[in-house]
Regions:
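Metallo-beta-lactamase
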Residues: 63-64, 119-250
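Conserved beta-strand hairpin/beta-sheet module of binuclear metal-dependent hydrolase folds
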Residues: 27-77, 175-188
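Accessory terminal helices/loops
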Residues: 219-224, 232-301
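N-terminal signal peptide c-region/cleavage motif recognized by signal peptidases
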Residues: 21-23
Length: 301
């Protein structure tokens, strides 16, 4: 589904300053967003096509070959030239589909933050070992590791897509802020009407860092927020950020009183009876209650 979004009104000072360098943004066509969201088998992960008049940038690349092919179809149907793919997170559901996308658009650059690219390279053998047998022909045969993005901006037809989060602990979690249309896309921090992936955030410090990232998004006052994972039909606005913040707080409270993972699962289901992702909730509960070992990426101490 396409999401036309209005152009940001610039302040007088900013407009005057910009006019000496190039035409004001008001004279440019606003960028357009189109979200592709996978089904539950791929954790409802999102990819977002950001389009200008003739060119486009893709944020995140899907998990399975099937979803990647559907994503390619969306890009082709848009009629835009795909210039670049940015991978915002180092989990397989964000990059396994790169192989299919590269085959369809070989001239499009594929990039990620330095920390994300390094994590993908280091963890790829284990990820293939785990997911290869489960995905079979639906998984990558020649997975692609992104190149390192130079700087913290992606340019699309004179408009800036800012990669935010590179100044955090290791630059592992990032999202894309598009100020001209006040939109946040990419990243794994925002969930919409879905149980949060807490397996990688099994300490109070990690959850606090997560909450800080969400408040950073909130402070930008975006009008559009595309959750990295969301139940189909979930809103794409700040309500997803507030949902995620509330969930983290509720999770911490339930975790502190739950005797075991079953009690934690039941408590969160009572609190969020309509949330998708029961498998995600169950895995996180086992990890957080110490019933299952999980090699998490630690970015906060």
């Amino acid at each position: 589904m396409k999401h036309p979004i209005s152009t940001v009104a610039l302040s007088l000072a900013a407009t005057l300053a910009m006019s000496f360098a190039r035409p004001a943004l008001a004279d440019e066509a606003p960028l357009q967003l189109q979200t592709y969201r996978a089904d539950a088998g791929s954790f409802h992960v999102a990819s977002v096509l950001v389009s200008g008049k003739t060119d486009a940038v893709l944020i995140d690349a899907q998990f399975t070959r099937a979803d990647a092919h559907r994503l390619v179809a969306d890009v082709l149907a848009s009629g835009k030239r795909l210039r670049l793919v940015y991978v915002s997170q180092g989990d397989p559901d964000y990059y396994f589909g790169l192989e299919v996308i590269h085959q369809a658009f070989p001239e499009a650059r594929i990039v990620a933050s330095r920390a994300t690219a390094a994590h993908i390279r280091a963890s790829l053998p284990e990820k293939l070992k785990v997911w290869g047998p489960k995905l079979g022909a639906n998984g990558p045969s020649k997975p692609i590791v992104p190149q390192v993005l130079k700087g913290d901006r992606i340019e699309l037809e004179g408009q800036s897509l800012q990669v935010v989060g590179l100044d955090g602990p290791g630059g592992f979690y990032s999202f894309v802020w598009i100020p001209s249309i006040k939109a946040i896309v990419g990243g794994v921090r925002v969930f919409g009407d879905m149980h949060l992936w807490t397996s990688d955030s099994a300490t109070p410090a990690e959850r606090q860092c997560w909450a800080q990232d969400l408040r950073r998004i909130e402070a930008l006052a975006p009008t559009t927020v595309v959750p990295g994972h969301a139940k189909p039909g979930a809103a794409e606005d700040l309500s997803a950020v507030r949902f995620s913040l509330g969930y983290l707080e509720a999770y911490g409270e339930a975790l502190s009183t739950a005797a075991d993972s079953t009690a934690l699962i039941n408590a969160m289901k009572r609190r969020y009876p309509q949330a998708a992702g029961d498998d995600v909730l169950a895995l996180g509960a086992k990890v957080n209650k110490g019933e299952m070992r999980w090699d998490a990426v630690t970015v906060c101490r």
